[in-house]
């Protein structure tokens, strides 16, 4: 298949397969990095002559890999995109980091033979290695994968616009949500006009011991959304780390961005707006399976 969607444990398996099969190059963006079986495999491929580059936002364990890696910092926000490019043509865009924590619940989309998208993503990695924080696709770049947006940019406004187009349903799974940003504004307006919105948030707690998403949970519930918290103890996972929304069973929004002000305005993020109903149906089927 040219396009495939993966969830949870499936993601590591496809990442491993793509790394093993790469012929020339592997370029990766991630927020957190730590030593893991996947990074061991990347080191092996580097020793075999494959060009391996990783741009990360945070090295969690201090491990220095035997491939090219840059840990980058920004004046505002964090470096948070999550994607892989293989041989300048195949792309995985994910909610998953390159870290030893594999038990988190995530989603990823593999696009094969997408050179336009691959070139855009590779230029992002190359810019980070050159210590250049370039504005890229801030209002959206049309590619074989759909519309790619890098924030800081217009990503949240574009998601809002997609929500405003909704006629029947919005189904979303998101790790972190705050109650004031364009995405939430669009969602609130869609609900007001009768769109059925079902949402699942992670129930992680901040340093104060309070559930971070509780305020957004209460706000959206009061507006008529069907909101629930994920229950990780039932699925042996550490956190619900998704960042996706399915609109009318046709349009899918996915990538690295949480629905927060930081995600909208400060962090480096990748967002994809895709109109392939087959992708939407796979995300929707997954959502329905966990929204019991």
Where are these regions (language model features)?
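N-terminal "mature head" segments of proteins
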Residues: 2-6, 22-25
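Active-site beta-loop-alpha junctions enriched in small/polar residues
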Residues: 31, 175, 202-204
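Secondary-structure "cap/kink" motif recognition
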Residues: 11, 16-25, 158-169
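N-terminal carbohydrate-binding/catalytic regions of secreted carbohydrate-active enzymes
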Residues: 24-25, 29-38
């Amino acid at each position: 298949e040219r396009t495939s969607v993966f969830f949870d444990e499936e993601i590591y398996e496809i990442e491993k397969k793509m790394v093993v099969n790469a012929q020339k190059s592997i370029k990766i963006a991630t927020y957190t990095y730590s030593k893991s079986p996947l990074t061991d495999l990347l080191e092996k491929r580097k020793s075999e002559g494959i060009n391996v580059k990783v741009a990360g936002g945070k090295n969690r364990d201090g491990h220095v890999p035997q491939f090219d890696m840059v840990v980058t910092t920004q004046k505002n926000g964090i470096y948070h995109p999550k994607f892989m490019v293989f041989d300048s043509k195949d792309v995985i865009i994910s909610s998953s980091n390159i870290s030893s924590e594999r038990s988190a619940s995530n989603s990823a989309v593999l696009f094969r033979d997408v050179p336009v998208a691959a070139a855009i993503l590779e230029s992002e990695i190359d810019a980070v290695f050159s210590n250049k924080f370039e504005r890229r696709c801030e209002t959206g770049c049309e590619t074989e994968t759909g519309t790619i947006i890098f924030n800081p940019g217009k990503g949240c406004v574009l998601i809002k616009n997609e929500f405003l187009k909704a006629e029947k349903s919005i189904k979303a799974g998101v790790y972190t949500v705050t109650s004031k940003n364009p995405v939430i504004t669009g969602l609130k307006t869609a609900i007001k006009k009768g769109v059925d919105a079902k949402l699942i948030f992670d129930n992680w707690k901040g340093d104060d011991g309070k559930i971070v998403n509780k305020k957004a949970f209460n706000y959206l519930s009061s507006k008529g959304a069907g909101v629930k918290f994920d229950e990780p103890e039932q699925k042996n996972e550490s956190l619900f780390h998704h960042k996706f929304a399915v609109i009318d069973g046709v349009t899918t929004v996915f990538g690295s961005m949480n629905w927060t002000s930081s995600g909208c305005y400060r962090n480096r993020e990748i967002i994809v707006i895709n109109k392939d109903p087959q992708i939407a149906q796979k995300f929707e089927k997954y959502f329905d399976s966990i929204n019991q």
